[in-house]
Each structure stands twice: as C-alpha cells, then as structure tokens.
Amino acid sequence: MNSIKFPVLDRTTKNSVISTTLNDLSNWSRLSSLWPFLYGTSCCFIEFASLIGSRFDFDRYGLVPRSSPRQADLILTAGTVTMKMAPSLVRLYEQMPEPKYVIAMGACTITGGMFSTDSYSTVRGVDKLIPVDVYLPGCPPKPEAVIDAITKLRKKIAREIYTDRIRPQQGNRCFTTNHKFFVVRSTHTGNSDQQLLYPPPSTSEISTETFFKYKSPVSSHELVN
C-alpha cells in the first residue's frame, strides 16, 4: 500500500538527488499519514472497527484515528444520517483543516438505504451535505473493502494538485456551518425528492423555531442548505 509511484519523484540524478515539486512532496507526506475521524451511526461502523484488530492492523497504513475533527484530514461516515444529525455532520466537516477528504461507507450513507423509503427524516445520501471523495458500497462493506477504498483515496491524493482542489470549493460551496431547514410538501415515492440550494454562507443560519415549531402540519421535511 506504500508502493504508490510518483513520476517526478522517480527521476534522480547521478548524485542520487531527488528532483520533485513542492506539491508532489506535500502529497507524498499526506497520503502515508491519513488521520481519520470516524463518524459511525449504524452497523457499518462495526466493520470498520474490525480494522483496529491484529488481523487487519490498519496502523501499518499510517492511519491514526482522531477524536477531534480539528486534528483529522479524513472523515469516514458510516450509517444512516438523519435530518437532525445533518447540521452536526456538516459542522464537524467544516472544523477539519484543509485539505480534507470524505469516504462514504455503506448503502445507508451513500443513498439512505432501506431507511430512506417513505421516510421524512433520512438524508438520501451524505453527498447532499458534504463532498464525497470515495464511495464504498455494501451492506455492510467488508474490512478488505475499506482498505481498498483507502488505497484508492491515497492514489487520488498522489495525483492531486492542491490549488485545483481548493478553488472549486471556494467558488461553489454547497455546505456551510449554518444551515436552514424548511418544511415542504413531499410525496412518498421512494425517490430522492430532497433538493439542494446554495445560498451565500452569510445568509444561512440555524433557527431553533425551524427545528421544533412549524406553522402547518406536513407529511415530510426537505433539507436545503
């Protein structure tokens, strides 16, 4: 897993001097020391916990689990995300330093799973809240699949240009620390009828009344940023 090759790093002179760029050196240092923040809400998280044991021993891949998002550069979401938990998840993501990455683990995290059918309180895909780098399907995915997802993420980091990643996030922000929840009419068809709106971060705010008080009864909620 540590044998990811860099074309620029492989070029050496006769005096064994490595010729590289600052961007490639930064990518090389980050891909071998990912610090994940674990956000597990359901059974998929138990499969990730298996990696901690001696059979898989994910420490040999440079993974150091952190309990604070401010010390992590990778968040791994596993399990169902509800409307009530959505602001907390986005707030945790915003607290992570750049550059940061997301792995969506399991069917419930990627699409809402079986809990999203005729459910008014389930987010149908965590990518409606935060940008996802690697999708890991399964119900639940095996520990070997988690290692494969981390390997693919490492390869992505190896080819990454930092400025190209930051610029789209700053220009097209689809997530903010503050959120708005609106109550709208919805049909229970099993399809994803949740939509995303992208207001400026300065105009978004969390209102307590939005969470607990509603002017008229409705059948479901819809999440918008």
Curated annotation (Swiss-Prot):
Gene Ontology biological process terms in this record: aerobic respiration; electron transport coupled proton transport; photosynthesis, light reaction
Keyword annotations from UniProtKB, A to Z: 4Fe-4S, Chloroplast, Iron, Iron-sulfur, Membrane, Metal-binding, NAD, NADP, Plastid, Plastoquinone, Quinone, Thylakoid, Translocase, Transport
Its EC number(s): 7.1.1.-
Binding site for [4Fe-4S] cluster: C43, C44, C108, C139
PROSITE patterns: COMPLEX1_20K (PS01150)
Cofactors (names): [4Fe-4S] cluster
EC class name: translocase
Family stated for the protein in its record: Belongs to the complex I 20 kDa subunit family.
Subunit structure and binding partners: NDH is composed of at least 16 different subunits, 5 of which are encoded in the nucleus.
Free-text function comment from the UniProt entry: NDH shuttles electrons from NAD(P)H:plastoquinone, via FMN and iron-sulfur (Fe-S) centers, to quinones in the photosynthetic chain and possibly in a chloroplast respiratory chain. The immediate electron acceptor for the enzyme in this species is believed to be plastoquinone. Couples the redox reaction to proton translocation, and thus conserves the redox energy in a proton gradient.
Protein name: NAD(P)H-quinone oxidoreductase subunit K, chloroplastic
Gene encoding the protein: ndhK
